[in-house]
């Protein structure tokens, strides 16, 4: 279980997180939504221990990660897999080398074991037989799948998805959403998805948390979010700007 308690973080004059409280249960799929620049990625960095809070706690299985030494923090991070918005593949490496990048550097795995685990990961994301291809040979959706294969090769307990459908057309986005659901069910992992895509939210989410003005504004099911009458929630999920806002 992951528990965030009264988390606060300021950058200069901007209070990005202002008392975030959030509990993420083992095995659930939580979608985090909110305005651009509203602190979703900052919250994610705190959960994985990449950013230190000004105050508050992030508890992973009961341990406050802000007070762990580097070795203990590394052990916690091994529980996590991450699919980045851009897939973050190395263009000069093959698909196999990308997926096995960290695994190969541990030097306690045989080449045969690494090859087997890469093949298993690719099969799980429905991309068998592409080990020798370079990222430039892949479409955007295929790159996302390879990025997910890299995230799951460690067999993590928690997978983070940062805008997994950004830059993809609706058909490919739908296939990625369905893949996320299948991977979650097959691996029985906790999944945390950051997205602005309301179709994706409805497809993958079991519970949704909305971050607004530095705090968790509300939580609920995707259906509850789409049916919300609260103007802050309603405008966001329908993509309607406030009349007081001006876009330039």
Go through the PLM ranges and name each one.
Residues 48:
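Helix-to-loop junction immediately C-terminal to a conserved catalytic motif
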Residues 63-64, 111-129:
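Conserved ABC ATPase "signature" region
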Residues 134-138, 142:
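Conserved ABC ATPase signature
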Residues 153-157:
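A short, proline-enriched helix->beta-strand linker immediately N-terminal to the Walker B motif
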Residues 159-162:
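Catalytic Walker B motif of ABC-type/P-loop ATPase nucleotide-binding domains
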């Amino acid at each position: 279980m992951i528990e965030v308690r009264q988390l606060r973080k300021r950058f200069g004059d901007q209070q990005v997180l202002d008392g975030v409280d959030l509990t993420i249960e083992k095995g659930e799929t939580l979608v985090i939504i909110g305005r651009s620049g509203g602190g979703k990625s900052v919250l994610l960095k705190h959960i994985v221990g990449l950013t230190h809070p000004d105050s508050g706690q992030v508890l992973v299985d009961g341990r406050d990660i802000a007070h762990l030494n580097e070795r203990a923090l590394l052990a916690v991070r091994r529980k996590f897999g991450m699919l980045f918005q851009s897939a973050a593949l190395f263009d000069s490496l093959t698909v196999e080398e990308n997926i096995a990048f960290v695994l190969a550097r541990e030097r306690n795995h045989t080449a045969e074991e690494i090859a087997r685990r890469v093949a298993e990961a690719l099969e799980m994301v429905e991309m068998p037989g592409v080990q020798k291809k370079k990222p430039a040979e892949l479409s955007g959706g295929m790159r996302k799948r390879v990025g997910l294969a890299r995230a799951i090769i460690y067999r993590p307990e928690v997978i983070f998805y940062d805008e997994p459908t950004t830059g993809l057309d609706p058909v490919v986005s739908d296939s990625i959403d369905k893949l996320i659901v299948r991977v979650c069910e097959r691996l029985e992992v906790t999944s945390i998805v950051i997205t602005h895509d309301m179709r994706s939210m409805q497809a993958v989410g079991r519970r949704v948390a909305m971050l607004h003005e530095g705090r968790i504004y509300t939580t609920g099911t995707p259906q509850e979010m789409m049916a919300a009458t609260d103007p802050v929630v309603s405008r966001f999920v329908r993509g309607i700007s406030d009349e007081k806002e001006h876009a330039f």
